Amino acid sequence: MSCCGGNCGCGSGCKCGNGCGGCKMYPDLGFSGESTTTETFVFGVAPAMKNQYEASGEGVAENDACKCGSDCKCDPCTCK
């Protein structure tokens, strides 16, 4: 399992990819220098909090104004 859970992420130059290569949705939880062969991940789930001022574009990752749509294509490609 990738650290982004297989979710699409936007990288530099408005190139989309899978896993850790873009939005960094989940931090790298591995530690270097250890010789363990297994890792334990604990993820919690909480209800989303929304307010009337929330920006539109739900469900997309954003990186430098580059948005990645659900089909793993940049939408729109406006990286600066």
Swiss-Prot record:
> What keywords sit in the KW lines?
Metal-binding, Metal-thiolate cluster
GO molecular function term, any single one: metal ion binding
Which InterPro entries does UniProt cross-reference here?
A: Metalthion_15p
**Coiled-coil blocks:** none
| Matching Pfam families | Metallothio_2
Per the record, the similarity remark reads: Belongs to the metallothionein superfamily. Type 15 family.
Tell me the function of this protein.
Metallothioneins have a high content of cysteine residues that bind various heavy metals.
Q: What name has this protein been given in UniProt?
A: Metallothionein-like protein type 2
What is the originating organism of this protein?
A: Brassica campestris (Field mustard)
